[in-house]
């Protein structure tokens, strides 16, 4: 290709891209909050209802009774006596459960679930140290070891806590 052809091709591209940017083909898209969306189809609606009415209750039961995830926070909050039991990253699973309930409550109000989550959140708030630190593995163990081993999932758990807090606005 010679220089004239290249210049002509570049000029044509610039001209058409400028025209396309100025030309509007329809309405501007406006974002909306998902709380303003109602799912009514035959595929997703029943699944979301099952999630709200069954799955979330099972998740809460798993965190509260099958594992010690809620209990660890109640112990760290001073509500009940005990010691840490479970996996080092168990806090994150509780936070993800809270996030799931929070998003579901946006479109499927359920006072029982909301009250249960509020109780769990009260344990979390009471367990948090004055400096903001919050991880039951260390709160109920050796606090001098916090932030010393990134394989212990402190940042991972913190990220899930933040996501849960955003969801449970």
Regions found by a protein language model. Name each.
Residues 1-22:
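Bacterial Sec-dependent N-terminal signal peptides
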Residues 21-169:
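Glycan-recognition and catalytic cores of secretory/periplasmic carbohydrate-active enzymes
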